[in-house]
Amino acid sequence: MQDTLSLYELNALVRRSLEQCLPDEYWVQAELSDVRTNSTGHCYLEFVQKDPRSNNLIAKARGTIWANIYRLLKPYFEESTGQLFTSGIKVLVKVTVAFHELYGYSLTVQDIDPTYTLGDMARRRREVLRQL
């Protein structure tokens, strides 16, 4: 009989493998979805990517912004862009990759680049004006 692993053991192996293979911070482009803040100030959200032709989802990941980061990041982003930090906007975020045995894969946000969102807003504005 083959050696077996419990689900927890397998998930722990996945966590250790990800920690070794993806130890750094990464800048990731994505759209925000399902942004919500809990009573302790942590922000939980989904990052999504859609196919530009069909608008169908092609990638999704859970995200977390811990309260100590979110307290600084949200006002910085909103003041820089004039845009609420909410679902439906495209962002460039610096993340670390995490995997928890119980909660699975997620991205933890460390920073945000508001100039990326400003560029996307300007591009969308130009498209609307062109259609008029």
Indicate where each model-derived feature is located.
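Acidic, two-metal ion nucleic-acid-processing modules in DNA metabolism proteins
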Residues: 1-132
